[in-house]
Amino acid sequence: MSYKKLEIWRLSRELVIEVHNMTFLHPKFEQFEEAQQIRRSMKSVKSNIVEGYGRRRYKQDFIRFLIFSIASLDETIDHLETLSETGSLKDSRLSENLHQKMTLLSKKMISFLRSVEANHNEFPPN
């Protein structure tokens, strides 16, 4: 099995693309501040899923990287809220749509983490 078959990876990949595209809607001064931060934190969500999956042979490593990924998603949600609250992201429907998708991903990631904690042996090393 490949990490690309994980639903949490697929959802995070979609969000990386959506967040990346959303950041070009911001004023120029935000391109190098909050917009850059939200792109990085969202990419970190996906990357930590991949790295954790690559270390799935070692239960604690797998869990640690999933926790890093969840923390990065929390950071991303905070950046999204900041962009909305400061008026840098003016499209409230886009903001709400992204927030809903991130919240759904968060729930799925927590569920996946619990599954790994309880059933680690079901994840073959290769």
Language-model region placement:
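Amphipathic alpha-helical assembly/interaction segments
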Residues: 1-126
